[in-house]
């Protein structure tokens, strides 16, 4: 799955830069020898892996330097660069997957995953990131591993005999998701409602003890809610930052609900973290009964779904596919509440848990501690073992815990029953010689156990080769985190038998599953190959087939003696000397080679060098160099034999054209002739029916064949699913420079992926057929055509199901301007539109959906993701703006006036009453998305543009920028003391608008030396500009405000940027409430007497002013001191609004003074209000 893409994706996400992104041209390949370097590198691919080279990170690459999660451990610039522009068929990106891990750095002692899937396809399309994350999270799970599923409760042994004195309850839960629907981080409302309906209908088919009732969270009565809380069945709206950042709380409680049977021991949560969470439980010690109910219920639900054409997301590698990688596999958590007050204090408690693969927590849930010796004990594993195996580990472990608790109650010594400390055991094993492979990443490290090592360490093959000889290269070379090497070699043919206990599992792992009883197929009859003589030479530059052969009776290169090596050389030369016709050639020994011959072989790219790779030198393949080594080639230079390199011989057939058939024919005929010649001398190749041709490295067993073509695929190689296409065709790619090189111009060396289990003809056929298809795809892409229909069938993901439910939000309980103005007609008209930057209507309205509002506080419920939103979604934004701003007409023009000289007064506000003055506004930079939808790169660009502009300020405005990232404690304390620091958003309004993403990246605070001119960068808007001082001089504050703003704007204009502004909306900002001027001019004013008058609010309304407490938004005054500011933003100029404030505050102060003197204030009131005061 995961190869297909829609026609839109072919052009929009096929490796091309998205709108607004700059493509970095790839450097040209100027190496004339690159095409032939592949084979002259010497050793097989598995033995020459090198470290990943430095890669320049994409501008959107996140800063994870302070993070402690598996995402941070797994993500590299090269991985991110490769997948950051890809989209699944439902439109999900890798940034969506990893946002929760970026936003939540984690705890030093608690490692989270940091990654979620938005749909099933994520695990395939973004496998370069998910695979290493899954491997780390599940303690080693390679990408070719197969998961085991077993939901047959009869396979569980015991579990019905827990002592109820100790086991208080048993519970088994898992998750299931329905294929074709988005997962909770990404699903639409319609998809969520579909899932609810599909699951509800399936659950309705259950009968007998499983028959139950569904309780939707939407519209749930208080009585029902209380009942479910009392039963501990109700799940709450997510508040965890991990879930919030993954966007799992959207549209709450729409589409969520709880189902349980009449006996209340089988429960299903719908649309919580996964589509369903299935739970079987009871207050007893009968885990067998609980597990049986669990399996029966699950199987019946699955059958009901299948009857309606649905299925659970499952594959043989990951098992059941769920939202969080931590739950892949079974998704099972089998837990018991167990009382072990004595043993839980024993030093051996943790050892028992580790031994049985168990984990503990308190009975209060995740991350709680036990307070009375009662624990929730559950299985540690999810992936790689079956449901039965995981529940069995709990059953066996809990039995042991009870046994030990009882022993302690009797005062018995239990020290002999406690597994020894693994670290001590490990140290003792290392002293014995057992290698420490705990930091290694190779197949040897994953397969070798102490028991295997101990059983083999003293064995030798008849020629004297030991286990240490086999594994030394893997011990000395830990490997690379993202490149899995084998870590083993054979010293002779018998190595594979004598040391089969380690070779067999390594071979199985390396070759993607190859059991001990498998039989390998050999076929080197070139006539059986179909086609291959017509690969288009415009695309296919060269063809090559190579293999290795070893001669029975002689040790392999890691172990052979000088005499054996010389004998191999003699046998080989003797056979090759008998070649005639087109195969006739000459042998060039490396020992004593003349400079002239060496130069010629270098020019022909035939010469192989002395091994320098630590993988080869640790395997002792460089010994006695260059004795016994040499190169033979025919006169046409298209058939080549290396002698005593990594294997006894390496045979290569090649030519510069697209005729793979001719290359393979020559390969087969040459090999067969060579074998005939040595057989006449009584020699044979190493071969057996299980392993095929026996060679030094287990990676080359079977055929040992690598059939490769150099093919030009500049367009297809940029296609989002190129790697998945290759995997489906059983092919692999590398650059034309050899192992671990990358293509720089779209030319690749494409070869067969398999070696063992299929024949030579089959493997070359894969290459021929696959390359033909790749070239066909390249040609279609050149014509601008879609390639979906010719993709390999097995790699086409199932397209998303088209929901039957309606996507329109439920606004029945909402009180915000968006919900008041939205209609189904407007929604249907706009819901499928996008701005050029990709912002959707749902991006804009999500905060209003998720925050219904307060009966007495009307919020907007709408944000813009970029400037274009106000045009594309105008049918919604226009009525919201009109309603929010008291009837702002569609054809209205907003006046702008930042000439402070036009302000009358303001420098004479009485400081006895006016404590401070402040003017703030926001500004956003055209061409860059607004905070709800900006990328990390855009946020960084805003920061750069703004700070560079601010650095040009001089005189009283000169200041310094303090980025939140990397801020010192000293700076932080100082900014808190000055009340300048802004915090990470915690308001649900901002969180649901996606404004806290990537915190604190790109955010910062700038202020001048006098600390009266302040700029916040990338808070709610690109910039928030503030002028302030502790006095009653609003005129001076406003002059500084206008002066600073103008100078910053002039500076950014000089760099080719400008603020978002138009004549209708004025300055364009994120929230419609701030459109126009974005200005809030406020004073802290003491009016304790006036504020107690009934007419106080009427005066403010009349003067177009508003009040709040001095603690900020939605705070109340406690001592008669208020923060008074202008009510309006749009339709009036900056000067007009500040003038309103100045005039209004003067009136308030005069009224307060009159009241202090005991005077009647009616005559001082505005005329319209005077009658009301009587």
From Swiss-Prot:
The keyword ATP-binding belongs to this UniProt entry's keyword annotation: yes
EC main group: transferase
GO CC terms of this entry: cytoplasm; cytoskeleton; extracellular space; motile cilium
Listed Low complexity bias regions: 18-39
Residues reported to bind ATP: 169-173, 232, 277, 333-337, 542-546, 605, 706, 734-739, 749
EC numbers, comma separated: 2.7.3.2
Family per record: Belongs to the ATP:guanido phosphotransferase family.
Name recorded for this polypeptide: Creatine kinase, flagellar
């Amino acid at each position: 799955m995961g190869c297909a893409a829609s026609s839109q994706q072919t052009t929009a996400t096929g490796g091309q830069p998205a709108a607004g992104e700059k493509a970095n041209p790839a450097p040209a390949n100027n190496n004339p020898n690159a095409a032939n370097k592949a084979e002259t590198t010497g050793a097989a691919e598995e033995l020459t892996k090198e470290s990943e080279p430095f890669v320049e990170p994409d501008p959107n690459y996140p800063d994870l330097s302070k993070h402690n999660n598996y995402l941070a451990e797994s993500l590299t610039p090269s991985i991110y660069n490769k997948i950051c522009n890809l989209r699944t068929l439902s439109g999900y990106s890798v940034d969506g997957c990893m946002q929760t891990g970026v936003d939540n750095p984690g705890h030093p002692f608690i490692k989270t995953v940091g990654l979620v899937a938005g749909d099933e396809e994520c695990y395939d399309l973004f496998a370069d990131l998910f695979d290493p994350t899954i491997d780390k999270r599940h303690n080693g799970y390679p990408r070719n591993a197969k998961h085991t599923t077993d939901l047959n409760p009869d396979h569980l042994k015991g579990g019905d005999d827990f002592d109820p004195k100790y086991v208080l309850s048993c519970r088994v839960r898992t998750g299931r998701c329905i294929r074709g629907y988005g997962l909770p981080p990404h699903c639409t409302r319609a998809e969520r409602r579909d899932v609810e309906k599909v699951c509800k209908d399936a659950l309705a088919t259950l009968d007998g003890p499983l028959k139950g009732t569904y309780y939707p969270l939407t519209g749930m009565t208080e009585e029902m809610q209380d009942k479910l809380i009392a039963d501990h069945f109700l799940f709450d709206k997510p508040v965890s930052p991990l879930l919030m950042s993954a966007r799992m709380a959207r549209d709450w409680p729409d589409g969520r609900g709880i189902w349980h049977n009449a006996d209340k021991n089988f429960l299903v949560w719908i649309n919580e973290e996964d589509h369903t969470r299935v739970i079987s439980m009871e207050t007893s010690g009968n885990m067998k009964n609980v597990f049986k109910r669990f399996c029966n219920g699950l199987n019946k639900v699955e059958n009901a779904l299948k009857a309606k054409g649905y299925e659970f997301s499952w594959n043989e590698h990951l098992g059941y596919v769920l939202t969080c990688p931590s739950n892949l596999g079974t998704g099972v958590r089998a837990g018991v509440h167990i009382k072990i007050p004595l043993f839980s204090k024993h030093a051996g408690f943790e050892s028992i848990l580790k031994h049985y693969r168990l984990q503990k927590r308190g009975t209060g849930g995740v991350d709680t501690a036990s307070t009375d010796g009662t624990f929730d004990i559950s299985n540690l594993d999810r992936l790689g073992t079956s449901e039965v195996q995981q529940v069995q580990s709990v059953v066996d472990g809990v039995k042991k815990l009870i046994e030990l608790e009882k022993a302690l109650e009797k005062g018995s010594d239990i020290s002999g029953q406690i597994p020894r400390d693994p670290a001590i055991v490990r140290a003792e094993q290392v002293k014995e010689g057992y290698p420490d492979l705990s930091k290694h990443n190779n197949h040897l490290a994953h397969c070798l156990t102490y028991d295997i090592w101990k059983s083999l360490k003293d064995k030798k093959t008849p020629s004297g080769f030991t286990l240490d000889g086999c594994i030394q290269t893997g011990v000395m070379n830990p490997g690379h985190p993202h490149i899995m090497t084998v870590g083993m070699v054979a010293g002779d043919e018998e190595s594979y038998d004598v040391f089969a206990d380690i070779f067999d599992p390594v071979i199985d792992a390396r070759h993607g599953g190859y059991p001990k009883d498998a039989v390998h197929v050999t076929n080197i009859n070139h006539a059986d190959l179909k086609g291959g003589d017509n690969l288009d030479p415009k695309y296919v530059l060269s063809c090559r087939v190579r293999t290795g052969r070893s001669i029975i009776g002689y040790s392999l290169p890691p172990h052979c003696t000088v005499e054996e090596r010389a004998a191999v050389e003699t046998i080989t030369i003797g056979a090759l000397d008998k070649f005639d016709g087109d195969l006739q050639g000459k042998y060039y020994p490396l020992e004593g080679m003349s400079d002239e011959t060496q130069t010629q072989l270098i020019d022909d790219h035939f010469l192989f060098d002395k091994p320098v790779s630590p993988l080869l030198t640790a395997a002792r393949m460089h010994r006695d160099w260059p004795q016994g080594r040499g190169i033979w080639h025919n006169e046409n230079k298209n058939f080549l034999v290396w002698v005593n390199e990594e294997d006894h011989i390496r045979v290569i057939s090649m030519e510069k054209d697209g005729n793979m058939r001719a290359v393979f024919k020559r390969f087969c005929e040459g090999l067969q002739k060579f074998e005939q010649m040595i057989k006449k001398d009584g020699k044979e190749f190493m071969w057996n029916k299980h392993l095929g041709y026996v060679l030094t490295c287990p990676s080359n067993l079977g055929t040992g064949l690598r059939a490769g073509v150099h093919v030009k695929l500049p367009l297809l190689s940029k296609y989002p699913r190129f790697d998945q296409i290759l995997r489906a065709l059983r092919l692999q790619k590398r650059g034309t420079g050899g192992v671990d090189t990358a293509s720089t111009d779209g030319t690749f060396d494409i070869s067969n992926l398999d070696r063992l289990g299929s024949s030579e003809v089959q493997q070359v056929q894969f290459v021929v057929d696959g390359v033909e298809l790749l070239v066909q795809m390249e040609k279609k892409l050149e014509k601008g055509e879609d390639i979906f229909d010719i993709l390999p069938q097995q790699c086409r993901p199932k397209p998303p199901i088209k929901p039957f439910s309606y996507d329109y939000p439920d606004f029945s309980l909402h009180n915000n301007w968006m919900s008041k103005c939205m209609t189904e007609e407007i929604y249907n008209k706009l819901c499928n539109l996008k701005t050029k930057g990709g912002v959707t209507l749902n991006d804009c309205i999500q905060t209003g959906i998720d925050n219904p509002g307060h009966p007495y506080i009307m919020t907007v419920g709408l944000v813009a993701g970029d400037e274009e939103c106000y045009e594309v979604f105008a049918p919604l934004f226009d009525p919201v703006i009109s309603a929010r701003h008291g009837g702002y007409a569609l054809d209205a023009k907003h006046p702008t006036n930042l000439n402070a000289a036009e302000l009358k007064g303001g420098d004479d506000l009485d400081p006895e009453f006016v404590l401070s003055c402040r003017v703030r506004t926001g500004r956003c930079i055209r061409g860059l998305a607004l905070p709800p939808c900006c990328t990390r790169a855009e946020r960084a660009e805003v920061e750069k543009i703004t700070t560079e502009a601010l650095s040009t300020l001089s005189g009283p405005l000169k200041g310094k920028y303090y980025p939140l990232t990397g801020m010192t404690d000293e700076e932080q304390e100082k900014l808190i003391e000055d009340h300048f620091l802004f915090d990470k958003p915690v308001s649900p309004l901002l969180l649901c608008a996606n404004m806290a993403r990537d915190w604190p990246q790109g955010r910062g605070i700038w202020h001048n030396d006098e600390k009266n001119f302040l700029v916040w960068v990338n808070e709610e808007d690109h910039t928030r500009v503030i002028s302030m001082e502790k006095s009653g001089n609003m005129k001076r504050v406003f002059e500084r405000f206008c002066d600073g703003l103008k100078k910053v704007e002039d500076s950014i204009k000089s760099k080719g940027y400008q603020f978002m502004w138009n004549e209708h909306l004025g300055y364009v900002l994120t929230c419609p409430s701030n459109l126009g001027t974005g200005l809030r001019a406020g004073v802290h004013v003491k009016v304790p007497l006036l504020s107690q008058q009934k007419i106080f609010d009427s005066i403010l309304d009349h003067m177009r002013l508003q009040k709040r407490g001095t603690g900020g938004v939605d705070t109340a005054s406690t001592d008669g001191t208020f923060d008074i500011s202008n009510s309006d933003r749009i339709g009036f100029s900056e000067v007009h609004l500040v003038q309103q404030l100045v005039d209004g505050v003067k009136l308030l102060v005069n009224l307060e003074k009159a009241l202090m003197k005991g005077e009647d204030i009616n005559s001082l009131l505005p005329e319209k209000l005077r009658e009301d005061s009587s």
